[in-house]
Design a protein with these regions (language model features):
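Gly/Ser-rich oxyanion-binding loop with an adjacent helix/lid
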Residues: 1-109
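C-terminal nucleotide
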Residues: 10, 17, 91-185
């Protein structure tokens, strides 16, 4: 119910309408499993309000922002916008948060002869909010070594040329950031 209230509150904040409805939801996703279940649920609630009360006028980016605000302020999850935006767009995308560019990614696994399988490992992301919330600060910390505010402004070659203590969490996170971006064309 916190996410539903949060979505309604965020919609109120942007001047969008909302109201009551009856719904039943079933899911086989475990809460805290790392599959963006809270982002997907918040996006779903926003889309329902958007369709019922706003003639579907909110664009996917606005829907994602509403969902993010609901998670941040009402669900206690200090998340970014990536999961909500991917859920709102409904497809695999490359998102450059520095430029705002969003590029669809061809994820037709069957055409490539692959099958995407999800496995329940029994792990949980529940309780990781404090560590997760430190990610933006860690990224800015590394960026500050190069006189930049955001890690996306740093040249990866400059980052890799510097001698780092690779056991430091901010360094590992920055390396992951650059490695992930290098994987996407």
């Amino acid at each position: 119910t916190a996410l539903v209230r949060g979505v309604a509150s965020a919609m109120y904040d942007i001047g969008a309408s909302f109201g009551g409805f009856d719904a039943t939801l079933e899911s086989e996703l475990s809460a805290g499993s790392g599959l963006s279940s809270s982002a997907a649920f918040a996006v779903l609630m926003c889309r329902i309000f958007n369709g019922l009360y706003n003639n579907s006028e909110l664009e996917p980016y606005a829907v994602a922002r509403v969902a993010q605000q609901a998670e941040n302020l009402h669900f206690g999850k200090p998340c970014g916008l990536m999961d909500q935006l991917a859920c709102s767009l409904g497809k695999a995308v490359y998102i450059d948060f520095l430029t705002g560019e969003i590029i669809p990614v061809n994820a037709d696994f069957s055409r490539m002869g692959l099958t995407l399988c999800l496995t329940d490992t029994g792990g949980s992301h529940a309780g990781l909010d404090t560590s997760y919330a430190r990610i933006p600060a860690d990224m800015r910390y590394i960026a500050s070594f190069f006189g930049k505010e955001l890690l996306g402004e740093v040249d990866p070659a400059e980052f890799y040329a510097k001698k780092w203590n690779t056991s430091d969490r901010p360094v590992r996170r920055a390396k992951h950031f650059f490695d992930e971006n290098a994987r996407v064309p």
